[in-house]
């Protein structure tokens, strides 16, 4: 999202709200206009602004053993950035938490800017990767028939607006290749602002989505996709998203602490599927461990391995211009997007994968090197892709020991 510059939510914001209502924004809910004007760009403080639904700590918590080795992690980092200190970079980039796990043990755990292990941090788009796992569980439970189901099977009102929605499948949403329009522009009219601040995300997704292209033709990062997937999940399971997460994933994974999922508003009560999962960094690391262990915890199946593998694979037989809507990817030819997960291709198929979020939130998983890297931060501090490259270097350095 782009930053909106306003000085305070006082008389100036009230005047701007009135001006907005008189200048083409009258169709937006006042609460939406107020949020855009007074909250500005999405930031980590939003965990305290949005209402939320609570997650309880697992009664069978998974406590991660420690074998701290800061020097080994520093050496791995220095191979990538010679002569630099990792802790200095983390401090300078607004990092709150940085954790490294190797073979299931915590080998590095540092906190900055007043944060500690008890600090609850917001996921931003890391939440999308949790959502992908939930979709796989709903398929396993028989609540969603298959990836190839048309989304109108669960959201028939979309077909009433435009019959072309019938051609979009659940998998198109997971791959962010639906052809649904998504435009990032400044101020109220951008889909980036709408999908983040709107107080009724169900209505937004069902009534205001438009189709621009052919399903499966192009990848375009689009926050309507997780909203629609959340609606499908909600209707298919008959449960609130947070409740389904609690029962099928949070508790079985052994989350040692509680958390929450931010809601669009108290009145609507719909989870912010695109961004709003809030937890401690040490529990976010368990998502990475779930990937490392092919969906198992202590030998018990939490998520079927077939889903864990399929969810992380690059798109097969993609057109040559599949990523044309994301031109920055041309500079990173090894980068791909799977089912709400990012990846770095490897020739032998054992790809590096990551859940990534705004301001540099990261859960990076190297199955080859048995490493998980978690970073939470106040801001990016360095380029967005640089956090993946840093984690890649740390994983390679530790894996070579």
Predicted ranges, named:
Residues 104, 122-147, 173, 229-233, ...:
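Active-site SXXK
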Residues 10, 19-116, 140-144, 393-401:
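N-terminal leader/targeting segments and the immediately adjacent pre-domain N-terminus
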Residues 89-99, 112-157, 161-168, 214-221:
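Short active-site loop at a secondary-structure junction
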Residues 26-34, 352-401:
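Structured C-terminal helix/loop/strand segments within mature extracytoplasmic catalytic/sensor domains
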Residues 225-232, 276-297, 306, 361-377:
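Active-site-proximal alpha-helical segments within enzyme catalytic domains
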């Amino acid at each position: 999202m782009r930053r909106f510059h306003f000085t305070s939510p006082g008389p100036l914001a009230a005047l701007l709200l009135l001006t907005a209502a008189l200048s083409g924004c009258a169709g937006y809910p006042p609460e939406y206009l107020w949020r855009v004007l007074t909250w500005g760009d999405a930031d980590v403080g939003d965990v305290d602004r949005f209402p939320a639904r609570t997650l309880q700590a697992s009664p069978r918590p998974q406590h991660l053993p420690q074998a701290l080795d800061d020097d080994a992690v520093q050496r791995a980092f220095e191979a990538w950035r010679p002569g630099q200190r990792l802790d200095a970079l983390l401090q300078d980039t607004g990092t709150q938490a940085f954790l490294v796990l190797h073979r299931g043990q915590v080998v590095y755990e540092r906190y900055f800017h007043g944060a500690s292990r008890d600090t609850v941090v917001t996921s931003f788009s890391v939440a999308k990767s949790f959502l992908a796992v939930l979709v796989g569980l709903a398929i396993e439970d028989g609540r969603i028939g298959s990836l190839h189901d048309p989304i109108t099977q669960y959201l028939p009102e979309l077909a009433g607006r435009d019959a072309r929605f019938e051609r979009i499948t659940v998998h198109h949403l997971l791959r962010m290749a639906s052809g649904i329009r998504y435009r990032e522009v400044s101020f109220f009219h951008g889909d980036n602002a709408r999908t983040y601040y709107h107080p009724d995300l169900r209505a937004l997704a069902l009534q205001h989505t438009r189709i621009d292209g052919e399903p499966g033709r192009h990848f375009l990062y689009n926050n309507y996709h997780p909203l629609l997937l959340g609606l499908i999940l909600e209707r298919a399971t008959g449960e609130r998203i947070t409740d389904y997460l609690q029962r099928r994933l949070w508790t079985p994974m052994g989350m040692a602490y509680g958390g929450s999922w931010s809601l669009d508003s108290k009145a609507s009560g719909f989870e912010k599927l695109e961004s709003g999962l809030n937890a401690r960094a040490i529990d976010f690391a368990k998502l990475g461990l779930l990937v490392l262990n092919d969906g198992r915890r202590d030998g018990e199946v939490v998520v079927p391995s077939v889903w864990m593998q399929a969810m992380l694979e690059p798109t097969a037989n993609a057109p040559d211009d599949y990523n044309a809507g994301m031109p920055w990817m041309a500079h990173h030819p090894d980068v791909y997007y799977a089912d709400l997960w990012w990846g770095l291709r490897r020739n032998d198929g054992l790809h590096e994968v990551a859940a990534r979020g705004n301001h540099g939130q990261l859960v990076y998983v190297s199955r080859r090197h048995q490493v998980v890297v978690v970073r939470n931060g106040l801001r990016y501090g360095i380029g967005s892709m640089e956090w993946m490259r840093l984690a890649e270097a740390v994983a390679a350095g530790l894996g070579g020991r």
